[in-house]
């Protein structure tokens, strides 16, 4: 069984207007004390032997605010398995060729850039601190540093969005050498700046769905195969870490607001950086990973839900009513079903929540 290790780096120079993820001010980068706290927790979960994770994901926040030396300390302490995928999320304005070379030497072999848009006016609206020029420079620097596994994030259905904006952003990322692209529909979260003050020019739900289907089609045309609702990859470059999540595998998350699922049990750290630093933030148990979780997560994937595996793992079978609903989904173009595997089409992924409401 694969093990994924997530290390949360909560520090950010500034908060993006759409973001409601837990973060902490980081004008001076990532404190050494915080890295020491992560190392403390690593030792706590592996007191006798290293974890040897199959994937490590340095997420945030802004993990590229780490020094390469501190990234090396964390990776060395985790003692990843041979061939492990080791990802670092990065904001384009925070990296140089020198720091990227340092991360590469530290053991990072996959870099993920938060691009979002190729239009500077849109980036300003989103509260992103980089420019399109800096994004292009970051991709070029990553290639020179030796990275061959590069991901880029695109946001869809932004204020005053057009297909032309998507095309420009895809061109920037594809020409930058990306082997993987994550494309997310903007969601207005209540606790974000956009939630408190919604921007003008937001697309309607139907328009957002059209942008999503347009993105799927054009990403496929450029060689990025959809393997999950929001993720697309060149062959062999699917994100291995997130696949552990979607396959309900074991993963350990360390840091404030980080979540874990180990041996079928979920737990998380409180969203309190100060408490984490001072060793006063014990993990909180959060129930188990059950059949419903598995069904929900498997139907995010284009490969779909294998009913035999579902039964073998949880002793669950679809009822006559559920199978009848599945057949209606197939007729409507929302799903494919060959009697053994149920998979949602791109049109079905848009209305996944409604489909799940009938299946759960």
Regions found by a protein language model. Name each.
Residues 341-345:
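Minor-groove-contacting beta-hairpin "wing" of winged helix-turn-helix DNA-binding domains
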Residues 331-340:
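A short, conserved structural fragment
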Residues 10-21:
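Local cysteine-cluster metal-coordination motifs and their immediate loop/turn environment
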Residues 347-360:
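Short, amphipathic alpha-helical interaction segments positioned at domain boundaries
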Residues 2, 23-45, 52-316:
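C-terminal scaffold of the Radical SAM
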Residues 1-9:
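Immediate flanking context of iron-sulfur cluster ligation sites
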Residues 316-328:
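Short amphipathic alpha-helical interaction segments
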